Swiss-Prot record:
SUPFAM superfamilies named in the record: CheY-like, Winged helix' DNA-binding domain
Modified residues (4-aspartylphosphate): D58
CDD domains given in the database record: REC_citrate_TCS
Cellular localisation: Cytoplasm
Record-linked PANTHER family: TRANSCRIPTIONAL REGULATORY PROTEIN DCUR-RELATED, TRANSCRIPTIONAL REGULATORY PROTEIN DPIA
Pfam families: HTH_64, Response_reg
One GO term describing the cellular component: cytoplasm
Domain Response regulatory: 7-123
Protein role: Member of the two-component regulatory system DctS/DctR. Essential for expression of dctP.
Disulfide linkage: none
Keywords for this protein: Activator, Cytoplasm, DNA-binding, Phosphoprotein, Transcription, Transcription regulation, Two-component regulatory system
Species for this entry: Bacillus subtilis (strain 168)
Name this protein carries in UniProt: Probable C4-dicarboxylate response regulator DctR
Modifications made to the protein after synthesis: Phosphorylated by DctS.
Amino acid sequence: MARKEWKVLLIEDDPMVQEVNKDFITTVKGVTVCATAGNGEEGMKLIKEEQPDLVILDVYMPKKDGIKTLQEIRKQKLEVDVIVVSAAKDKETISLMLQNGAVDYILKPFKLERMRQALEKYKQYKQKIEANDTLSQEQLDAILNIPQQAVQDLPKGLNHFTMNEVTAFLKQQTASLSAEEVAKALGIARVTARRYLDYLEKTGIIKLDVQYGGVGRPVNRYVLKG
């Protein structure tokens, strides 16, 4: 039987932002805020007590920030998903949070519709995962929103596993990235990342953003088409 409700724990140190987010989240059908916390230490206790499905996590907080909190969640192997909502827009923080398993990253200030989209996407993801004991590649692609164009016949030297990794990673980003940044985030060679990005650009999955900055060669940056 399909689940009808998902519990959310909101970890945010600004009381006003916390209240606004709480009020909005409760307007999304099937989602309830089970508890709120003002810092990471309090949040960790509530995760164990309330056992939420999802944590909405800020980064800049006293006592224990969002980075340390997410790392602790993974270290303790707590079964909870995390969406980051933060003003932290530096690539180091964003990459670190995604590498530690954040399923989405929303930058403050944000439009409420962006939060709604994140929650609806999360609900769909959980429903599809929980409905099956085993999954086919096609079902996984649908869950991860991998465009079908990216998993057809690939040129020699490219494989579906890495293609899915690259595409899934790009889908989580809000800004364009260079081949070097993609390579670093996924732990692959820059030239390898460039080959996959070039293929995705040629097939219309992503678009190329050539940036000119000061002296030197222009930098090719890539972003998933909306």
